[in-house]
Regions:
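A residue-identity detector for tryptophan
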Residues: 36-37, 64, 112, 130, ...
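Membrane-interface helix-boundary motifs at transmembrane edges
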Residues: 46-58, 105-118, 166-175
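Structural signal for membrane-spanning alpha-helices in multi-pass inner-membrane proteins
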Residues: 36, 77-80, 103-107, 215-218
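C-terminal transmembrane-bundle signature of multipass membrane proteins
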Residues: 1-4, 31-37, 149-232
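Alpha-helical transmembrane segments of multi-pass integral membrane proteins
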Residues: 60-80, 89-104, 117-134, 150-159, ...
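Membrane-helix interface and helix-disruption motif detector
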Residues: 2-22, 78-94, 109-115, 132-151, ...
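Canonical alpha-helical transmembrane segments
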Residues: 29-46, 99-108, 158-165
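N-terminal topogenic module of multi-pass integral membrane proteins
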Residues: 1-92
Length: 232
């Protein structure tokens, strides 16, 4: 976003003391502080072993944010379904519509046992199909920058939902899940500054926010290590 707005349209030179640059510095400071806090907490606290505890909603407001993100993702998928001509893309968009409720219900899925685990696979299938279709449609384009960020965002969202789905199969890797969710958020937000379709913006925006919320839930549910029992 800074690169796209910092340069003067007439001279082509970067503008000095641009507000976006000041904001970027402030964001970097906040990111550094958040990483410092996170690294300290992950050294002392442990992730719960049970998915019900690891994905439990800490606050009701968090659930509403997830629902809003899911609605945005569903709107984007519906937009793609009606606007795209490709049959494969329509199939991917339909999977996206069906996957949006899974995002909203992600913290409740562990309660449903095997059915919840099966539902968690649906977003993985959606992003897999979307990634394949998107690459197929753009493989002949020699200008990688025109679609590179969007395909990267799709891939990172795929990685994030794969790591979240692993919780339902008792194969959770908390640190990898947190890293994948943050990558999904960053690449999705970066894609919003490109000239992509409204549907893709909504889908990536919704899933980017949703995976970020799930990342926060995972971190928030870290617990102190159990005290060691004295043995004599």
């Amino acid at each position: 976003l800074q690169v796209q707005t910092i340069f003067d349209a007439e001279t082509g030179l970067p503008a000095l003391h641009a507000p976006i640059t000041t904001m970027l510095v402030a964001v970097l400071v906040l990111v550094a502080a958040a990483l410092w806090w996170l690294s300290g907490r992950m050294k002392t606290d442990c992730a719960p072993e049970e998915p019900e505890d690891a994905l439990a909603l800490p606050h009701r407001e968090t659930g509403w944010i997830l629902i809003a993100a899911a609605v945005l993702a569903a709107f984007g998928s519906a937009y793609l379904f009606f606007k795209e001509d490709s049959t494969l893309m329509k199939a991917a968009a339909l999977l996206g519509i069906l996957s949006a409720p899974v995002l909203a219900m992600m913290p409740q899925l562990p309660r449903w046992g095997g059915f919840g685990a099966a539902l968690s696979v649906m977003p993985v299938l959606f992003f897999c199909l979307w990634l394949v279709v998107f690459y197929k449609e753009n493989a002949a384009n020699p200008i990688l920058w025109e679609y590179g960020m969007e395909i990267l965002a799709i891939a990172m969202c795929l990685l994030a939902v794969f790591r979240l789905s692993a919780y339902l199969f008792y194969r959770a890797k908390p640190r990898r899940a947190i890293f994948a969710c943050m990558l999904a958020l960053v690449t999705s937000l970066a894609t919003l500054t490109d000239s992509v379709s409204l549907g893709a913006r909504a889908v990536l925006g919704g899933w980017g926010i949703g995976t970020a919320v799930m990342c926060w839930i995972i971190i928030n549910n870290f617990v102190p290590p159990a005290p060691e029992e004295d043995t004599y």
